[in-house]
Amino acid sequence: MRYNKIRKMDISNGEGVRVSIFFQGCSFHCKNCFNQETWDFNGGLEFTDEVIDEIINLCREDYISGLSILGGEAMHPKNINGTLKLCKRFKEVYPNKTIWAWTGYLFNEYLMDKEVSKYIDVLIDGQFIEEKKDPRLKWRGSSNQRVIDVQKSLKNKKVVLYLK
């Protein structure tokens, strides 16, 4: 598994000041994707336990509200085990900080029954669709994408949108 970059202080991908990791590899190839350099599964840098340690360390400051996971596609079958490992470790160390994740997969069709969902607080799901692009939307690029409260969705066994 590989990653493209880590942003130490990110204010555009989730609420508050966050640490963001952009995983490498995506098979969706959305038209006009903002992050095409993350498509190649062989690009970027190796994702190791040391990288997880670095992310955990970067999140230690009180002003960091959580971790954001983007891509590429962190939930792709080639990446999901590493994503799960990162999420588990993050929540062990920071149970009161949030994990936000972006995926082209639909939560109710692919992720609802995956173990990684137990650790994610907010998920933006759905592929970016150029024809539905709306720059006024918060945390997403196109109107088909949903901002989901994952824990409430799991509890209710149906998609519950995140309202803030």
Give the location of each predicted region.
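N-terminal [4Fe-4S]-dependent radical SAM core
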Residues: 1-22, 27, 35-41, 160, ...
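Structural recognition of alpha->loop->beta junctions
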Residues: 53-56, 60, 112-132
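A generic structural signal for alpha->beta connector loops
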Residues: 96, 119-120, 144
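P-loop/Walker A phosphate-binding loop and immediately adjacent motor/lid segment at beta-alpha junctions
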Residues: 78-83, 88-91, 133-164
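Conserved, mostly hydrophobic/aromatic
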Residues: 21, 30, 123
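Conserved C-terminal portion of the radical SAM core fold
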Residues: 60-69, 93-94, 98, 124-130, ...
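Conserved Radical SAM active-site core
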Residues: 1-3, 17, 35-101, 107-113
